[in-house]
Structures are given as structure tokens and as C-alpha cells.
């Protein structure tokens, strides 16, 4: 594993929902593919009613510990059905889900969450959790969305070109190599890019058509990763459109969509880029969001 800052495990948040079960399956396959241990965690949190107490009442605690134990035991059995030799550990915590997962992100290669499918309210809550983890966590986060993608579907990565470095491109190459599938690198621009509005110059000589200049940006961003992963077949796509629109279109044909936490025009201190937010809430396939160098 060569992803910068990568940890040594795949961590999945477990709550027993159908979306969580999908996340466990996805996380188990990812851990097996990357030869990493799988950690299944459940944080039930202490309700506000007990906030002033050192520990909640014993009957409440016992009931929640038993529930967590059953949830995690079922999730571990599910993971072992996918790979009987996979190292799996489980952890229940009094911490709430977000504090627990942020803490686990310190040593995780990736955090994995499920989506809620048909439940709009639950999906909103999970989306909020994912956004919080994308902002405060220290590892990439995958939200497992959509149906079961075809095994030969490509990995798709959004390439910005403005960031001083885009480590998620390397992560996308690694994921495509592990799956032995094509990588589609999508670079999208429009006439209202914030970078242009603030005077950043993309073509200092003013001679190349915009399309040629943007294609050069894409090729330059991919060049070092093509050298590092020569076995990965790459399709480079440069288009004039809204980034979120085209990436969401591609999500219907991909098995994994990879993006940075902030894109062009992203400023230090902003919570999360609008494109990353749209992908977390609306992607039709699992979406992996990696932190921007500005974070």
C-alpha cells in the first residue's frame, strides 16, 4: 500500500441496517484484496440524558453492550463468509459513531460506511456522518452506495488539476490495479471556474485552445501515476461540463468513484467541496473521498 498517509486496516462502521451489511461485505472484499485486517466497529454513544454521569445506568449499558455484541458477531460471520482467512476484529464503544470513527481513522487505510437505500431520512443522516468524517477524519472514506456493480466496470476518478497534489489519483490507480479493471480519469471544467475568476492562469501564452490546455492539465496530472502503475489501462476524459454532473453520470457505469475532498476553487478552511458532497449523497456506485492537501 503506497497511498500517502495510509494506515494498516480497513474499518467499517456497523449498525445492523441493510446499508451497513453492504458496507461490511464491501469492506471485507477490500481488506482481502489489499491483504489488510478488517476492523468492525459499533459506537452506540451515551444519550444526552446521561451526559452528566460518569457511566450510564447499568441496565441501559448492559442492554446496549449485548446489542452491540450481537451486531458485531453477525458482521464478523458475514466477513468470514467472504474470506474465511481474513483477520477480523470487532470493537464496541461508548463513543458515538462519529467520534469513534474519527479516532479509528488515525490508523485506518480507509473508513467504510453504508448508505440507506430507500430511506431518505436515514440516508441524510448517513450522508451527514460521511461529511463529518471526510472533514475530521484522517483517512479516506468510502460510502457504499448503489446496486451491485459489474466486476469488470471501471474505477472512475475525478481529476481537478488545480490542487498542488492530488493523492486520490494514486489511490484510484491502486484500486484499479487491485481489481484489474480500466481506470477512467475524468477532468471537467466550465466557464465559471473559481480559479479563473480569481485570476489563475492555465495557459500563460494564450495560444492553445481551452480544450487543449485542459487536456494538458489532465495528462500532466496522470503522468507520474501512469509510470508507477504501467499495468493499469487508462481512459482520459476531458469535457466542458459541471464536475458533479459528469461524475454522477459516470457513477452509473463505475464500480468505484474516487474524488478529493475539495476541488478547484477550494479554500483552506472550507468544510467540504460541493462536488464531494453531491457524490456522497447521490452517487450510483460506492464513492471514495480522500482528503485534499489543503485539509
Predicted regions and their residues:
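Short glycine/serine/threonine/alanine-rich loop segments
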Residues: 34-37, 86, 139, 181-182, ...
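Short, structured interface segments
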Residues: 129-147
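Structured core of small recognition/catalytic domains
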Residues: 182-261, 268-270
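Small/aliphatic-rich secondary-structure junction motif
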Residues: 2-58, 154-205, 226-237, 295
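Short beta-strand elements of ligand-binding domains
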Residues: 112-115, 141-146, 287-291
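Structural beta-alpha unit
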Residues: 1-6, 19, 59-62, 77-111, ...
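Glycine-rich, Arg-bearing micro-motifs that act as flexible, cationic patches
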Residues: 113-132, 152, 256-282
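A short acidic, glycine-rich active-site loop
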Residues: 58-70, 204-214
